[in-house]
């Protein structure tokens, strides 16, 4: 019931990832296994798409699809996936009982299952609707651990063999279900290293551990994710290295003389540590992703703004840890102390039977779990599992000690009558010794202990009223509160996504911050530029750059990308003052994420934000696309303590805004507001959870200059463009040869359709104008653009603005902008072409009839491709190393001359 509290707000999937997992499971059921394995999802990461099988949690989709076939019972898949995590959370509590029972006995197992059922970190990531990787991954991972430890403990070698194979199998499936399960690699590695010191049956270990490790690696490598990189990388080495050490240690101990065994063992241990560090430091092993490295080293968080921006990657604070684990930490600490105190006094005095190696494993997983949870908030559930194991064993030890019973024996009375050494008949009836059991510490102390324990367990579940273990796990499904900070339930997102599904063309592409990608794809049925898989940080940085760019620049970038709509989400509070509706912004929408946009895009936040790092500056409101998309205008600023108002921002003041639609649907701006969600259209006071959808105006005419497209002054005489069809006349015999470090690019001119443009290019080339310039704008799959004289010596912020000092008229034709065609770049006006040109490295029909095609690459296409693959700054599309994209010389040759003087192979061999 605790896990199902979110259903009070509405029966929906929760968070973001579950919507993709639902869509993927539906695809698997509808199209079958073969189609799923080869599924390239074109609705995500437009235009590249996504290989689902290699980038998602495959076992989650297969498990859900398999169980739905069996237990679906006529329910919809959507409803089934909502209940799925609650069911597996309950099943995992049973696995936890079995796991801890193996380590600490039945009492410890019962305590563990109880703690697991009410632990806030476990519940938060396993509530109803949480159809994500954690619940199933933790189930498989803990099941694998249980079978592994149970196999080591089993006296029957055949049963042990089966359990070890099962343990490796399910642990590997856990790895593939949720990457967080790989946390278990650390305690497993340390445990395997410790085993030869605490287990004497070395013959068993010699085959048991290698068997378990081999199965784990084989199954893990069989999945596309984690895949073979797991086996051959640092993570696989975390199992292979300790296994090699264990085998070596056993042989060293076996063949060493009694007096040298310890010395040799320590030498092997030290040498293994040095060798392991050397191997990992050499970078010969495949390194895990940044997230895994960040989990090991929390100081890396600030080095990646995208990782740092995700709430679940934040480092938990002391208050949060104390709220979650205070009582459990108390039991865990006391339990550890009692276990080691008893073992130091007398091996046989432990009140419960715990084998040496099980004690060691509990201690290792507890310490490592506490460390892991201190790095990532998302790993709190692993910390909770580790602390629960220690606390349960500790509480079992304490309880056994307190409630231990002492048996007293009462001797029979001997009759004084009769001969010596004999008893009377009556006394014979009492010769049997009487026994009486009492609590070792007395009845009162035992009852008091029970009361105290019950109180310690109950207090966190009822106090404080709004911050106890039960209340903190109750929150609305994210789709109903938009992921905001408010415990509200609105239909803003559902009705917006339904509107998108029914009112936009099916092939529409929607740009938004990546948080909303899965919702738009699944409930809106539309393609997005990025989503919650965060597969390409460069694309996410580019989206952030778009939001912070000028409206004209953002329009150009969106237009070039092929987007049709832009979505933005804003949260705030509406109130009425003197008959006017006013707003205070903040609460978890894009208005609260904008500072992360700036960090991810590499922008200086001081230009956009006031000194509180939240309140937008006038520049933000007037000069950024995001500021224009937010339908608000500053009215005043006030001090929340003194209620003093100011027309301008003062430190510590809060902004107050009025509603202003800056891009109305009937306007001629770069965007048109085509839909806004209900709470934005309400005139009642309260929380707003507003979703706005803007159409990108395809007919918009740029009004400002652009740094990526040349923007020379337009001649005072407006020249009307004409469209020319290619004639049967042969084009000029001249060709242009562009020399680069990768080889030559040979361009065949088309003066049959663009004679003035060809003549202009030849004139500039012959004068040396292009020599030393670079391809300053490189967009993979789109264009490489060059011809700006500013790239010879000007600063990067001037690249794309230079020209020849004059302009030429357009010469549109029916030629198509397909790969390797050469066309003239221009500014906002169609009459503004001058010197800059671009070579297509992909098809772009949206450019046809708008830009002048004047040539085609007939040789050196491989050189074009190499330049198109140069590493660029995602925020500007400029090459990181300009020399990679430099045109050393551009010459004009007749085709006959070129064929005799140009090298046979125009690409370089270097």
Language model feature labels by segment:
Residues 91-94, 410-716, 721:
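Extracytoplasmic
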Residues 235-252, 265-345, 358-359:
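Alpha-helical transmembrane segments at the extracellular/periplasmic loop-to-helix junctions
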Residues 363, 367-368, 372-406, 451:
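Hydrophobic/aromatic-rich transmembrane helices and adjacent perimembrane loops
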Residues 1, 36-44, 83-102, 107-155, ...:
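Membrane-embedded helix bundles of polyisoprenyl
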Residues 158-159, 201-207, 258-266, 330-364:
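Membrane-interface helix-loop-helix junctions at transmembrane boundaries of multi-pass membrane enzymes
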Residues 1-91, 119, 132:
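Membrane-interface coil-to-helix junctions
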Residues 1-18, 23-26, 30-36, 40, ...:
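Transmembrane signal-anchor helices characteristic of membrane glycosylation enzymes that use polyprenol
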Residues 710-910:
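Cyclophilin-like peptidyl-prolyl cis-trans isomerases
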């Amino acid at each position: 019931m605790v896990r199902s509290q979110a259903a009070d707000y509405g029966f929906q999937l929760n968070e973001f990832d579950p919507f993709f997992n639902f869509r993927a499971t539906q695809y698997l059921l509808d199209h079958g296994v073969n189609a799923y394995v080869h599924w390239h999802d074109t609705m995500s990461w437009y235009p590249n798409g996504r290989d689902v099988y290699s980038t998602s949690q495959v076992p989650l989709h297969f498990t859900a699809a398999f169980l739905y076939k069996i237990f679906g019972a006529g329910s919809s898949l959507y409803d089934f996936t909502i209940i799925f995590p609650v069911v597996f959370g309950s099943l995992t509590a049973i696995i936890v009982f079995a796991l801890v029972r193996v380590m600490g006995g039945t009492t410890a197992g019962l305590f563990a299952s109880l703690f697991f059922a009410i632990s806030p970190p476990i519940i938060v990531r396993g509530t109803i609707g949480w159809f994500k990787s954690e619940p199933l991954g933790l189930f498989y991972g803990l099941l694998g651990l249980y079978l592994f430890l149970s196999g080591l403990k089993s006296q029957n070698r055949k049963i042990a063999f089966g359990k070890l194979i099962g343990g490796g199998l399910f642990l590997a499936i856990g790895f593939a279900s949720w990457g967080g399960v790989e946390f278990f690699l650390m305690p497993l590695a340390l445990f395997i290293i410790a085993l030869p010191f605490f287990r004497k049956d070395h013959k068993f270990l010699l085959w048991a551990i290698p068997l378990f490790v081999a199965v784990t690696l084989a199954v893990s490598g069989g999945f596309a994710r984690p895949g073979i990189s797991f086996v051959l990388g640092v993570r696989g080495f975390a199992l292979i290295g300790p296994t090699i050490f264990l085998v070596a240690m056993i042989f060293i101990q076996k063949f060493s003389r009694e007096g040298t065994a310890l010395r040799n063992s320590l030498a092997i241990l030290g040498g293994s540590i040095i060798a392991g560090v050397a191997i990992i430091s050499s970078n010969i092993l495949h390194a895990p992703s940044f997230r895994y490295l960040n989990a090991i080293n929390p100081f890396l968080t600030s080095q990646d703004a995208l990782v740092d921006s995700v709430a679940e990657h934040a480092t938990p604070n002391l208050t949060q840890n104390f709220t979650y684990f205070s009582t459990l930490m108390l039991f865990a600490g006391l339990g550890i102390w009692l276990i080691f105190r008893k073992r130091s006094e007398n091996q046989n005095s432990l009140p419960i039977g715990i084998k040496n190696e099980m004690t060691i494993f509990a201690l290792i997983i507890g310490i490592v779990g506490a460390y892991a949870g201190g790095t990532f908030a998302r790993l709190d559930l692993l910390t909770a599992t580790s602390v629960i194991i220690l606390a349960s064993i500790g509480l079992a030890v304490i309880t056994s000690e307190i409630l231990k019973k002492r048996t007293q024996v009462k001797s029979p009375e001997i009759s004084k009558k009769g001969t010596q050494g004999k008893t009377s008949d009556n006394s014979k009836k009492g010769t049997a010794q009487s026994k009486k059991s009492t609590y070792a510490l007395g009845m009162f102390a035992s009852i008091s202990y029970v009361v105290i324990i019950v109180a310690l367990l109950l207090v966190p579940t009822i106090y404080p009223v709004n911050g106890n273990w039960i209340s903190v796990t109750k929150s609305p499904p994210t789709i109903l509160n938009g992921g905001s900070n408010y415990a509200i339930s609105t239909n803003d997102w559902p009705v917006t996504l339904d509107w998108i599904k029914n009112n936009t063309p099916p092939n529409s592409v929607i740009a938004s911050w990546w948080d909303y990608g899965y919702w738009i794809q699944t409930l809106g049925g539309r393609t997005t530029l990025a989503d919650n898989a965060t597969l390409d940080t460069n694309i996410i940085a580019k989206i952030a750059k778009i939001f912070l760019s000028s409206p004209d620049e953002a329009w150009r970038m969106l237009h070039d990308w092929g987007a049709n709509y832009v979505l933005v989400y804003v949260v705030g509070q509406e109130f009425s003052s003197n008959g006017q509706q006013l707003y205070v912004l903040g609460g978890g929408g894009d208005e609260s994420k904008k500072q992360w946009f700036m960090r991810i895009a590499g922008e200086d936040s001081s230009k956009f934000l006031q000194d509180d790092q939240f309140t937008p500056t006038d520049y933000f409101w007037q000069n950024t696309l995001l500021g224009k998309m937010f339908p608000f205008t500053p009215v005043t600023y006030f001090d929340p303590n003194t209620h003093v108002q100011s027309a301008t921002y003062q430190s510590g003041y809060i902004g107050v805004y009025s509603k202003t639609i800056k891009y109305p649907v009937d306007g001629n701006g770069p965007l048109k507001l085509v839909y806004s969600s209900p709470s934005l259209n309400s005139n009642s006071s309260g929380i707003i959870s507003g979703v706005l959808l803007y159409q990108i105006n395809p007919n918009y005419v740029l009004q400002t200059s652009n740094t990526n497209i040349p923007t020379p002054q337009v001649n005072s005489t407006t020249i009307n463009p004409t469209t020319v069809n290619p004639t049967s006349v042969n084009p000029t015999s001249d060709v242009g040869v562009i020399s680069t470090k990768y080889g030559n690019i040979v361009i065949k001119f088309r003066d049959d359709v663009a004679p003035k443009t060809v003549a202009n290019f030849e004139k500039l080339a012959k004068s040396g104008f292009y020599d030393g310039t670079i391809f300053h704008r490189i967009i993979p799959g789109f264009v490489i653009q060059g011809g700006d004289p500013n790239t010879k010596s000007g600063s990067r912020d001037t690249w794309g603005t230079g020209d020849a000092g004059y302009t030429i008229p357009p010469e549109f034709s029916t030629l198509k902008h397909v790969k390797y065609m050469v066309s003239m770049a221009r500014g906002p006006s169609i009459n503004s072409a001058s010197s800059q040109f671009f070579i297509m490295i992909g098809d772009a029909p949206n450019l046809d009839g708008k830009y002048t095609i004047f040539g085609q690459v007939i040789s050196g296409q491989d050189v074009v491709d190499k330049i198109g693959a140069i590493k660029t700054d995602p925020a500007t599309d400029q090459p990181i190393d300009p020399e990679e994209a430099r045109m050393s010389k551009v010459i004009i040759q007749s085709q006959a001359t070129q064929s005799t003087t140009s090298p046979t192979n125009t690409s370089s061999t270097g």
